[in-house]
């Protein structure tokens, strides 16, 4: 358990909730924009635990063009984070620094990421939070996987194929 928590300090994009059973939230934000800019989506996989220990995992979907939001709730046990790298699975949905695979009721497909522009880090400032990365029990942790990257792949959204080749993400 302690290794997992220390690893999360030096790899801020990784899951931070090891050993925590209540009053915790963590989510990751993936923005994708098609090359023609006709489609813009954000996907937020995450987990939430309330003060009583009630837990859930989720994937929130934001449509930046239609200005809509969908919330897909999952059992907490469907949430499977890696203990050594950024790799989060929620049932058949997968999010990593290389790609995301979606298997939601109205959105299915795979988007791969290339030429990631990462946040610079060092021993004393392992991520965007700087020295605050070392403060235990923060209410919120922030980590940047990529500030800009290329996309390849497509999604089937409401039975329509949407191409994200040569699109942009962050």
Question: What are the residue ranges of the model-derived segments?
Answer:
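Targeting-peptide/extracellular-domain and disordered-appendage signature
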Residues: 1-170
